[in-house]
Amino acid sequence: MIEVGEYKVKEGLYYTKEHEWAQVLEDGTVLVGITDYAQKELGDIAYVELPEVGKEVKKGEVLCEVESVKAVSEVYAPVSGEVIEVNEELSDSPEKINEDPYGAWIAKIKPNNLEEELKELMDAEKYAEFLKSL
């Protein structure tokens, strides 16, 4: 884990400038969630509008919304593909994102252009540098 001030950045993940993370699993699917920075900026998360299974998403488009006591924030897809699973646990316990932002994934995507799109994402070290610039 890399620490940037009060924020934690998990190594081995890919990151966007909008503070989403992507974890490539052994089977080639991708888990998506929001970063420690994002959950701290949002405050206590009250509701996660999970995407529909079967939804086709494009990198950079809205995947779902996360509602906190402060604001409603859009979560963008870090990769393109089909949503094949969602973390139903977040329907009942959205605060899990606050408790464990890198464990509480939101959706699993079957990517359709992974190799190219990963080149456009940041690794943990680059994302940590990006956080320092904010």
UniProtKB/Swiss-Prot annotation:
The keyword tRNA processing does not apply. One of its GO terms (biological process) is glycine decarboxylation via glycine cleavage system. The modification N6-lipoyllysine is found at residue 70. Residues 29-110 form the Lipoyl-binding domain. The keyword ATP-binding does not apply. CDD domains: GCS_H (cd06848). Pfam families: GCV_H. GO terms for cellular component: cytoplasm; glycine cleavage complex. Its cofactor is (R)-lipoate. The glycine cleavage system is composed of four proteins: P, T, L and H. NCBIfam families: gcvH, PRK01202.1. This is Probable glycine cleavage system H protein. It comes from Pyrococcus abyssi (strain GE5 / Orsay).
